[in-house]
């Protein structure tokens, strides 16, 4: 087997896609990740980088193009790192995402369950209800792939028009008043990120994240943002003086209007503060949550624990079919929103606790809480081993795992198997059209013999929860 050489051109066929959205080819038995390639294509590939176990390249000539290839519809494609799949038909994109989930569950999770048909989006454009634009060197846009270099973006095909308009207003404000942007390397500069959340009715909440307590000419910035975003609910300053690239602030100050935004999801109303987690694709989130409720198998009397509950969306959707639901979340503002949302929606069979998921889960388990269902929707890094151990100690009949990263999902599925929990069903849901990212819902349960063990029934009234 001859070693691949940098700057040489080889001929190979694309076999599939990597987790990063790159085409996969094999040349002389070696894996090559190929930018902009489509499954099934025969290509001439220029090798640009050679590592010990793999190489990276790009297509120089298409010898046999795929019928699933399309001309990218975004002028920033290839520069902006936001959308990986704008050169694919949507049918091929959905195939790639479902296959990514299947590979993760099989190779990493050791599961032989076949992933159900992927739940695709009805509209793959302008779907993001939350936009976060990094700011750097006077530019407001998105990072170049695998870098923190910002590409200035005037119009994005997956953001709401209100977000692009706010970005233009911030860009002009920086230029007109010589306001410096933040430099990650030096820790100096002021403007770090622009955050825009838009609800179903088109009303928006704007937050400017800054490396300081005040902005120059704040009233001018507010005026420009209000003119750019006609139905603006409020403008908030988020103070983030930490080094690095953390987005959200340590504290917030309202510059004008409201500091929260209301939205409707699954027939319920949710108040959302800036730090509260809320799925960015509202329509597909409803599809995702319906699948999660289906997997939970609720009949009206179950006790459900929802870890990483955010503003209480899944918690309150589950509450409609359960006896009682407990939500846990580490962000105080999100818990405040969750409690207020339950009050507004008239939902009385929910209770929320603020704290670290691992600590709360361990405390729940130690106090003898025995839920019928545990639902988890962790961040991209997945579940800590301590969370899985505590969840298993609570001995639920079913675990519903909502994941935004197939890799960490596969890892966690394997860890759950150590406690006897196996994947029973799995479904992929496309909340992020145009990108490589995909959501997954997995149902885990123990074997039939294990699930028939005698369960200890405890109500919350029987437990001392005063320390939470």
Task: Please place each PLM-identified region on the residue numbering.
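Short, aliphatic-rich beta-strand segments
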Residues: 196, 202-211, 269-273
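Short, acidic/hydrophobic/Gly-rich beta-strand patch recurrent on exposed beta strands
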Residues: 23-28, 141-145, 209, 338
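Residue-level signal for inorganic ion chemistry
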Residues: 25, 40, 83, 194, ...
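Rossmann-like S-adenosyl-L-methionine
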Residues: 2-8, 19, 213-468
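Terminal RNA-binding accessory module
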Residues: 1-76, 351-352, 359
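Extended interfacial segments that mediate partner engagement and assembly in macromolecular machines
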Residues: 60-72, 78-181, 201, 215
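Short, conserved phosphate/pyrophosphate- and ester-handling motifs at nucleotide-, phospho-/glycolipid
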Residues: 40, 159, 281
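Short, solvent-exposed loop/turn elements at beta->coil junctions and helix N-caps
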Residues: 117-124, 184-185, 191-193, 428-431
